[in-house]
Amino acid sequence: MPEPAKSAPAPKKGSKKAVTKTQKKGDKKRRKTRKESYAIYVYKVLKQVHPDTGISSKAMGIMNSFVNDIFERIAGEASRLAHYNKRSTITSREIQTAVRLLLPGELAKHAVSEGTKAVTKYTSSK
């Protein structure tokens, strides 16, 4: 039996027709996916504390993991506290209590004072 005539070649695996239709003349086919990171903030703090010191990409990766881990722990604890108190909103009070519960002694005191300072600065700039 004769094969049916093909009008156009089959699209390659993973390609999408809609992408080629909406494409403009100078655009590339795929954009680089954005990877969120705390790297710029870690670098800014490093330069405030030690202006003449650099950081390797491996160390930056570790710092990024550390910040993500602490963020998740504080957010989880604050969420639990809000749930216990039958609240649907996480406020600075829940965050502060979560920090006190998660961080040990002197570190918690410093974190709370820095957090309070940051919130005060933010509310005064509004």
Curated annotation (Swiss-Prot):
Amino acid composition bias (Low complexity), ranges on this chain: 1-12
Ranges of compositional bias, category Basic residues: 13-34
Gene Ontology MF term list: DNA binding; protein heterodimerization activity; structural constituent of chromatin
Key word Acetylation present: yes
Protein name as it appears in the record: Histone H2B 3
Sugar-bearing residue positions: S113
SUPFAM superfamilies named in the record: Histone-fold
Record PTM: Monoubiquitination of Lys-121 by the BRE1 gives a specific tag for epigenetic transcriptional activation and is also prerequisite for histone H3 'Lys-4' and 'Lys-79' methylation.
Subcellular locations according to the entry: Nucleus; Chromosome
Keywords: Acetylation, Chromosome, DNA-binding, Glycoprotein, Isopeptide bond, Nucleosome core, Nucleus, Phosphoprotein, Ubl conjugation
Tree of life domain: Eukaryota
Summary of subunit composition and partner proteins: The nucleosome is a histone octamer containing two molecules each of H2A, H2B, H3 and H4 assembled in one H3-H4 heterotetramer and two H2A-H2B heterodimers. The octamer wraps approximately 147 bp of DNA.
Main location: nucleus
In-chain residues carrying the UniProt-annotated modification Phosphoserine: S15
Similarity remark: Belongs to the histone H2B family.
Disordered as annotated region, ranges: 1-34
InterPro entries per the UniProt record, alphabetical: Histone-fold (IPR009072), Histone_H2A/H2B/H3 (IPR007125), Histone_H2B (IPR000558), HISTONE_H2B_site (IPR055333)
GO CC field: chromatin; nucleosome; nucleus
Cross-link (Glycyl lysine isopeptide (Lys-Gly) (interchain with G-Cter in ubiquitin)): K121
Residues with the N6-acetyllysine modification: K6, K13, K16, K21
Protein task: Core component of nucleosome. Nucleosomes wrap and compact DNA into chromatin, limiting DNA accessibility to the cellular machineries which require DNA as a template. Histones thereby play a central role in transcription regulation, DNA repair, DNA replication and chromosomal stability. DNA accessibility is regulated via a complex set of post-translational modifications of histones, also called histone code, and nucleosome remodeling.
